[in-house]
């Protein structure tokens, strides 16, 4: 039986002669019409270093697909550079781009009846966008990560792009010179690849490897190293075989796979954005997963990797120390991973990890032994309270002050907040509130990397809290709480906070509280009026109209009918 399970509707029979005529124009011959047609979703772009090396990988995937017996068809999908748009109106399009990427891949693959898809991406939303599409379509699929950037270097210190964000705060606080500010800027991003710490892109690529949708070791390879291209070729071969065997995302993206992913997130100290994206992917594939599952798993999985933003090392260091397979093997032997979960190769997680040592290699401290973790519990805490009845996400790694109670400093946008920080108007003990930045209110749920980096750069990271209904970059750390739900735009309690109100952030008790009486909150709620939408047309208008709560993954196709 031929392996073109879906594409035969386009390639077979007398009625499809015109269809075949067009396929002949793009390189098909008589012998090719019975082969599986494999889509290669190419996220190449010179907009960002994260994606500028991807075209070469797409060419390698195309050639390898042919050699494996498939017929490749390349098509483009978009990217937004989170780092370049950060702190601007453009950042409102970042989370929106996740949905656009998913829609575009689904549209091409289903519109052309493709038999499988290999997606290649680099910047943050490329990964969840591709995975949402794969979950929607449920056709054999594999993800190829474009690779991580190598660290920059300045004055004997390793740099990432976050170093440059923090340098802005340091310079504004008089802690570094303009020469150092520009020196860091010039050296932070030395070439191709996604931001180098365990930020969002590297977190999501690690998740896909842990879930079995990418090949072992592929998530931590440097973009510019030869092994990345070799891994891409192998990914294409594996995908063609998966089409033949009909290994589907629904067989891989199970409840066990999501639990494995959360365990790995905690172990590597991954980004808060993983919570949002995994909730979205799980709902798309039909797996029951809630924000509370992250808290349950957090309490039993230690952080065993010392990685930036709060740690010392970058992702290429993790790769040299054994990568995600080494992390997963440590979790597996300690009963924190489901070894029977299936992967796109047809092997189980346990089979893939069989030859990996139980202990991390000696002579390095990027990956710690299970008995000597960086932190005894996971770092992504789910906070609840009257300020976040649906929940909020806090990254508590590296936090020296786990409990803060202080006066609210209220800002209606990221820009006004950043201006106040750089002007020295935020003091130790303050709790900064940035609202109307949620999925609906932004719209688009911008990341607050500029304000949080400015707080760190000013030396206030241990003494100032920040809460928002927006998101945080994977490069953020400190006493910060994001994804506050319900958001301000739909009448969440965060909309009722007034300047000077006392707010408590308690990481130990997982509590986020506005210390105002219920009677006063009721009075304020009765006077609250929703704000008119900032955008009434275009993609931001559509997003604001359709998007769900961040506690449900901020999807645009949830409960449409």
UniProtKB/Swiss-Prot annotation:
Its cofactor is [2Fe-2S] cluster; Mg(2+). The modification N6-carboxylysine is found at residue 125. It catalyses: (2R)-2,3-dihydroxy-3-methylbutanoate = 3-methyl-2-oxobutanoate + H2O; (2R,3R)-2,3-dihydroxy-3-methylpentanoate = (S)-3-methyl-2-oxopentanoate + H2O. The keyword Magnesium applies. Its EC number is 4.2.1.9. It comes from the Bacteria. The active site is at 473 (proton acceptor). GO terms for biological process: isoleucine biosynthetic process; L-valine biosynthetic process. The keyword Ion transport does not apply. InterPro entries: DHAD_IlvD/Edd (IPR050165), Dihydro-acid_dehy_C (IPR042096), DihydroxyA_deHydtase (IPR004404), DiOHA_6PGluconate_deHydtase_CS (IPR020558), ILV_EDD_C (IPR056740), ILV_EDD_N (IPR000581), IlvD/EDD_N (IPR037237). Pathway: Amino-acid biosynthesis; L-isoleucine biosynthesis; L-isoleucine from 2-oxobutanoate: step 3/4; Amino-acid biosynthesis; L-valine biosynthesis; L-valine from pyruvate: step 3/4. [2Fe-2S] cluster binds at residues 50, 123, 195. Binds 1 [2Fe-2S] cluster per subunit. This cluster acts as a Lewis acid cofactor. Keywords: 2Fe-2S, Amino-acid biosynthesis, Branched-chain amino acid biosynthesis, Iron, Iron-sulfur, Lyase, Magnesium, Metal-binding. Belongs to the IlvD/Edd family. Homodimer. This is Dihydroxy-acid dehydratase. It comes from Microcystis aeruginosa (strain NIES-843 / IAM M-2473). The gene is ilvD.
